[in-house]
Design a protein with these regions (language model features):
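Structural signature of FAD isoalloxazine-binding scaffolds in flavoprotein oxidoreductases
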Residues: 1-9
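Long, positively charged amphipathic alpha-helical accessory segments at protein N-termini or as interdomain linkers
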Residues: 12-16, 22-40, 50-178
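Catalytic domains of carbohydrate-active enzymes, especially glycoside hydrolases
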Residues: 44
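Conserved active-site carboxylates
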Residues: 47
Length: 178
């Protein structure tokens, strides 16, 4: 197989979905580092990056009594289609060798499982240390696809982006950074 895609369900009574997304990002990056010694980064809200190229992402779907987490990673993909080739990459392309998916999955799941026991402020600190665009000028697209030029300052205790837009701090819950 070329990619690694998996899902799991968490009881939402014990977990906050925003923090869970951050927790998964940190767990994935730590799992990749432990297994391959590769230092990946995180891009808000849920992208796994290497050298400004996307390796994978996290999707969180909140239901009434549970949270469904979906994770997808480009592992051994060597022929990414031309539309995404400039923006995406795979572990195989970076490392020049094929990766065994099952052991990598075990490292990632073990890391996420450990992080689920951490306090939110520790997860946020870990996430911030792995984020590649703190205090950087960014192009931010709102959910209405409106482009906002801003400086990414940090995230708050809910995992929301705090941006500096024309000298004014704004909190944004959703959208994406280009």
């Amino acid at each position: 197989g070329e990619s690694l895609t998996f899902s799991f369900i968490i009881d939402s009574r014990n977990q906050d979905s925003e923090i869970l997304s951050l927790c998964c990002g940190v767990g994935i990056v730590n799992g990749i580092k432990e297994f391959t010694h590769l230092n990946c980064n995180l891009k808000w809200p849920n992208d796994i990056m290497f050298d400004n190229h996307k390796i994978g992402g996290i999707l969180i779907e909140k239901k009434k009594d549970c949270i469904i987490v979906g994770i997808g990673l480009n592992i051994n993909d060597s022929n990414l289609n031309s539309e995404i080739k400039n923006k995406a990459t795979s572990l195989k392309k970076i490392l020049n060798y094929s990766i065994q998916r099952e052991p990598l999955l075990a490292y990632i799941v073990n890391n996420i499982e450990q992080l689920l026991n951490y306090k939110n402020d520790k997860i946020i600190k870990m996430w911030l240390s792995l984020c590649n665009h703190i205090n950087q000028d960014i192009n931010f697209y709102t959910t209405k696809n409106k482009l906002v030029k801003a400086k990414f300052v940090t995230i708050n205790s809910n995992g929301e982006a705090i941006l500096n837009i024309n000298g004014k701090k704004e909190v944004l819950q959703s959208g994406f950074i280009q």
